[in-house]
Amino acid sequence: MIRALLLALLLANPALALNMSGFRDAPITRLSAEELKDFRAVLMKILDETPDGTMVEWKAPKTPFTSKVTPLKTYTGGKFPCRDATIESDARDRFQRGRYTFCKEPNGEWQFARPPKK
């Protein structure tokens, strides 16, 4: 259920679907549905407001989970703004760090996109 909720909340656009096998044992699977919703809201705010190179840390209110999000690069991908970001998450028994690309859709929502260009 958490995997389905994660997919629905973070990867809502089916055109940008992600292979979830890489997230099966991810720290984010430890979050409750409400915490996952909160994390998504924080991530959207970070992508909207945080300058490149600035790390923002978020801690789940109940679950032992901490995530550090650092926007790295802002650019235009086609017609829409995109941002590469590093997300480092730790849920005590699980740790994951990756670089991800998000692009802003016409509806104003940031969506997970293709892997970032190096």
Could you describe each region identified by the protein language model?
Residues 1-8:
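Sec-dependent signal peptide recognition
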Residues 12-14:
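N-terminal signal peptide c-region/cleavage motif recognized by signal peptidases
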Residues 16-60:
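N-terminal trafficking/processing presequences and adjacent post-cleavage segments
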Residues 57-59, 83-90:
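Short beta-strand segments that buttress and anchor functional surface loops
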Residues 69-74, 86-88, 98-103:
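Hydrophobic/aromatic beta-strand elements that line small-molecule binding cavities or substrate pockets
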Residues 79, 89-96:
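Short, cysteine-centered beta-strand-loop-beta hairpins and adjacent loop/turn segments enriched
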Residues 105-118:
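Short beta-strand edge/turn micro-motifs at domain boundaries
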